[in-house]
C-alpha cells in the first residue's frame, strides 16, 4: 500500500501529545484513595465536565473510522446513524439515571442482583464483560486502520502498540484522569473534526464546488429504506438507533460510570441533555465530514482519491491532502489518537470495575480497599490484552462499521431487554430475566445459523446475501426474540413478586430510592447555599467519617438537618468539582469555625486561601 510521507516534526508532535496524556494518568493517580475514586472519581463532578467527557467517550476512534467511511461511500446519510438518541431520552433522564444514582449501583450486574437474583447477576456480568471487551477491540482496530496509511505497518502490530499505551494510561489514572483528559480530548476532537471540514472546503475551492461535486444521492439525509444491503435506513435504525444507541446509554458501564461520577442526579441529567442535544450533533459533523470531503474529491478528481480507496482510512487520507502544513496534519492525526484514548480509557476502566465489583469482590473475603485498588489496576491491563484478541477477530470483517453492527446485534439484545423490563415492568420476574438471557442467546445463535429461514420475515425486504446475511436487520429479530421470551415467561410465572424488595429499583418507586440514598427521610426544606473563606475551616480530628459541623448562623441559612447530605466545594467553577466532596451534616457547632473531618479534607484537598461553598443535596 502507499504510505503517506512524514518527517520527524510530525512524529515529534504526535509523541508529545501521547506523553502529555500519559503524564495526566500519573498526575491524577494521586487522587485514587479508594475504588470509588478509581472508578467514579469520588462522585463529585459538574455537569459540563461530565457532558464533554461523555462526548469524548461516544465520539471515539471507531466513530472517525466508521462514520467517515460511510460518509465516503454514501454521503450525508452517514449522519442518520448518529442522530437516534433523542427518542429514549425521557426514559433515561427520569427513569434509569435516578435509579442507578439513588440506589448507589456500582455496576449493571449489581443492579440485576438487587432487582432479581445472583444468577441474573452472573449472566449479566459475562455479557457486560463481553460487550466492553468488544468495544475495546473495535476501538483498537479503528485506530489501527486510521494509522496504517501513515505507518504502513501490519494492522496487528499497530493494535498491540496503541493497546500498550492506552492500558498503561488508564491503569495509572482511573476515572478522574479519564474525565479531565476526556474533556480536553473532547475539545480537541471537535475542533479537529471541524477544522478538516474547513480545510477540505478550501482544498476544493469553496463550498459551492464542494456541493456541486456531490451527487444527488450523496446529498440525501437518509439512505434508501431497504437497500443497499450494507447500508439501508431500516437496518441502521434497528441496529444503530435502537439496539446500539439504547445499549450504549443504558448498559454501557463506561457511560453509567459517567452518570455516577456526577455530583448529583440533576447534574447527570444536565450532562445527558447537553450531550444529546448539543454535543452529539456537532460531533456528528466532526466525525463524518472527512468522508463527505473525500467523496467530493473522488468525484471531482478521481486521480487523487480512487474509487477503490479503503474507506476505513479515509480520514487520514483526506487529512494528508487538505492540511497545508505538516504540523496541521500531525494535529489532525493526534486528534484521532485523542478520540481513541477517550473511548478506550472509559471502556478499559469500566471493564475493570465490572471485574472487581462483580467477580473479585463477591468471591474474596472482605478485601481491603488497597487490595481492590491494586486488583483494579491489574485488571485494566489484563482486559486491554483481551481487547487485542477481540480486535484481531473483528479485523476479519469487511468494514469496521459492519463489524461493530454485527457485534451490537448479537451481544446487546438480551441485556437491553432485561434492563428495560426490569425498570418499567414491576411484575417482570427473575425467572423471566434468566430465560431472556439463556433462551434469547439460543435464538440469537439459531439466527446466525439459519438467517434465511428465521430473519427473512423481519427483513423488511432487504436483500439476502449469503456471505454477509442481513448485516443489520438481525438486531430486530434478536430484540423480538428476547422481548417475546421475557413477556411470555413473566405471564407464565406463578410465584408472586415481593415488591418490598424492589423499592427504588423501578420507575414507579424512584421516591424510595431518594430515601435510600440519604439513609433517612429527604429534607425538602432546602435553604440557600453558603459561601465563606476557606480560612474559616478547621479540621477536627475527633469527627468520624465524612462529617461537617456548621455554626448556627450557617446552619440556619442552609436549613439543613443532622444527617443531611451536603456538597462542599471550592468556588472555582472551572475545576469542575475536582476540589469538592459530599459530606454528612453533623450537629450544630458551638465554634465560629466550620469543622470538617480529616476524611473530608483528604477527599476535597481544599486550598485554604480560596473561597468555599456548601449546598444542601438532600
Short names for language-model regions:
Residues 527-569, 578-617:
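Short beta-strand-centered segments at strand-helix junctions
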Residues 572-574:
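Solvent-exposed strand-loop boundary residues in beta-sheet-rich modules
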Residues 1-535, 553:
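Membrane-embedded helix-loop-helix hairpins and adjacent transmembrane boundary segments
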